Swiss-Prot record:
GO terms for molecular function: 2 iron, 2 sulfur cluster binding; metal ion binding. The lineage of its organism: Archaea, Methanobacteriati, Methanobacteriota, Stenosarchaea group, Halobacteria. The respiratory membrane-bound nitrate reductase enzyme complex plays a role in generation of metabolic energy by using nitrate as a terminal electron acceptor during anaerobic conditions. Proposed Rieske subunit involved in a protonmotive Q-cycle mechanism-based electron transfer electrons to the beta subunit. Binds 1 [2Fe-2S] cluster per subunit. It is found in: Cell membrane. [2Fe-2S] cluster binds at residues 151, 153, 168, 171. Its cofactor is [2Fe-2S] cluster. GO terms for biological process: nitrate assimilation. It comes from the Archaea. It is a peripheral membrane protein. This is Putative respiratory nitrate reductase subunit Rieske.
């Protein structure tokens, strides 16, 4: 069974994510965003409600819709990661190679630096032979792979899991982390972008570039 190592990312999803805690400060909260490299037309709430069953879903969608408001109001304006950027947890601690065991995952972020966006990222670790050919081997290290946590369907956080898949709680999109975060269920039309990573000389996980595709909705 996959275990989630939680970081301090309170409020990131306005309570709709299973791995958000109540600790931390506002300055630690990641921002949900869309990427201008992806073309996304603004949608209204009526269309969102219709997609999940109509007005009877209003009460259950209060938290997801609050998060989606921020998706629509923000666009990507700079690099998410770049070569040499350290991966850190919600408290700003750099991630060591030994941080996760096989089958575990955690939410990480790029270490703060001027011009670098706050970008929630899913870090997972599996046995290297568990990954399919869809996973770029040059993007992974020591069984670690990293993917954007922003769902490619409507921009919610992919924060849940089910039978080894990563699940978005808003519309139940499912992604397989051992198959390049390919879509295996729900409405998303493309995989979560993968982040190229390696281990620094000091033993910490770092990025070797930016995500290999647009972050968030659109980009098809």
């Amino acid at each position: 069974m996959e275990t989630d190592r939680q970081g301090s990312e309170s409020g990131a999803c306005d309570g709709c994510c299973s791995d958000c805690s109540d600790e931390g400060t506002q300055s630690q909260q990641p921002t949900i965003f869309t990427d201008t490299r992806a073309s996304l037309a603004r949608r209204d709430y009526a269309k969102l409600l219709a997609s999940v069953g109509g007005l009877t879903a209003v009460a259950s969608l209060t938290a997801p819709l609050a998060g989606l408001t921020r998706v629509f109001e923000r666009e990507y304006t700079g690099p998410v990661y770049s070569d040499g950027i350290y991966l850190v947890d919600g408290d700003g601690n750099r991630i060591e190679e030994k941080a996760l065991s096989e089958g575990e995952k955690m939410t990480v972020f790029p270490e703060p630096r001027p011009g670098i966006e706050k970008a929630p990222t899913l870090l997972v670790r599996h046995a290297e032979d568990a990954y399919s050919d869809a996973v770029k081997t040059e993007y992974m290290v020591a069984g670690y792979t990293a993917y954007s946590k922003v769902c490619t369907h409507a921009g919610c956080m992919v924060s849940n899991e089910e039978d080894g898949t990563l699940v978005c709680p808003c519309h139940f999109g499912k992604f397989d982390p051992t198959d390049g975060a390919a879509v295996v269920g729900g409405p998303p039309s493309r995989a979560l972008p993968q982040l190229p990573i390696t281990v620094s000389s000091e033993g910490y996980l770092i990025a070797t570039g930016d995500f290999n595709g647009p972050v968030g909705p659109g980009g098809d």
